[in-house]
Amino acid sequence: MKRYTTGLLGLLLIASLTTGCKKDKGDPPVLPPAESMVVDFSNFASATKGASFSADAKGTENSTYEFAALTAGVWKLIINTTLIVPVSAFKASFSEAPEYLDDKTWQWSYTFTALSASYTARLTGQTVASEVIWKMYITKTGNGGFTDFLWFEGTSKVDGTGGQWILYQSAQAPQACLQVDWSRSGDSVGKVTYTWIKNSDPFKTSYLEYGMVTGDLDAYFIIHYYTGTKFSDIEIRWNTTTKNGRV
């Protein structure tokens, strides 16, 4: 009887410790929204065709708007080419289930394809106080391969209302090139700002800010760009339904 009681107590102790460990894990941190890394250029692109735009300086609306559209297109090109691998890696994480590591850290591990090549991604999220620290490591095998390259990192608020990303150019040129600051209101991202932070680059500190606001002109771009001799600014606001707006 004594052995039976001792064994039962042992099982209860093990069960208690196991349950306690599960409780200590808590829930995995919520991934920042995909829109926190990728600006939605679709509304702006559709507004470039057949839209009516006015400008503060009469007669300059066409050239100003066309240049703004070109500049926005450059940012879109950067995201869709230079940074397509880390962006694709982040998008793929939403269909994966994380596993608990330790020290309030969870990991998403999976494979994905970008530019006709296969990669392995390892995204970690560690909760520290009111923030989550994110790190994305990417591995490529074969030609031009590399292992566990930290392609981007960042932080987000635990409540999911905002955060920041830092993206590195490539495994061959591992220097920080893009900073993304984002904020969220309700179920949608209210503002995203791309800032070019690559050192020794004349375009450093150039930025593009995209946001959604209330009112008739409910979307906007603010573009701070380098003309080759100086920095200038353009602000574009438009209605996402009618595609009309102003520069």
What are these regions, as identified by a protein language model?
Residues 26-247:
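Low-complexity, intrinsically disordered segments exposed to solvent
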Residues 2-42:
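Bacterial Sec-dependent N-terminal signal peptides
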